[in-house]
C-alpha cells in the first residue's frame, strides 16, 4: 500500500541516526588478497568489493565460507550497543554483491546456515534482538549485482548489441573475470525474487 510506504519512508527520514552493518565473507580477507591491499589492487577500495577488484574466481571465493565461523557474534550485544548509543534503527546487508547471504535460503545454499561451519541465521538473530530491544530493523539486499549467480555472462552479448549502435555499455560491478552462465531472467526469477520473499 502506497500510504504505508510513504509513512515508512517518513519515519525512516525522521530517525536520522542508526547502524548500518556491512558484513559477510569479505570480512575474512579484510581488504587484503594474496598479500596485496585493496588500495593497490584498484577501485573501489572497500573490502566488500574485494572479489571484483582482485578478480577472485567464484570457486575460490566460495571457499571463504569454510572459514566463516564468528563464534563471538552476539545479536543482543550489537543491538544493545546501538540502542545505548541512541540509535533508532539497524540495517544489515542480508546479501551483498558476492552473492553470500547471512540467512538460510531454499534457492541458494551459499549462505551462513548452509555453507559455513557457523550454521546460524544471522539476519533472524538480529531481527529478533531488534524486536526485544525495540529498535527498528531493515535489510539491504544486493539484487542488481551478484558476482556468484548474476547474469554477468550476458554482458558480452549486451555490449556487442550496444557497440553496433555506438551506445555505451555500463560495466560497473560486472563480473567479467569469471561470469556465471545465468541469464538475467533466471537469476532474477530463480534467486533474487524468491530469496527475498
Language-model regions, residue ranges each:
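Mature catalytic domains of secreted/periplasmic carbohydrate-active enzymes
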Residues: 1-197
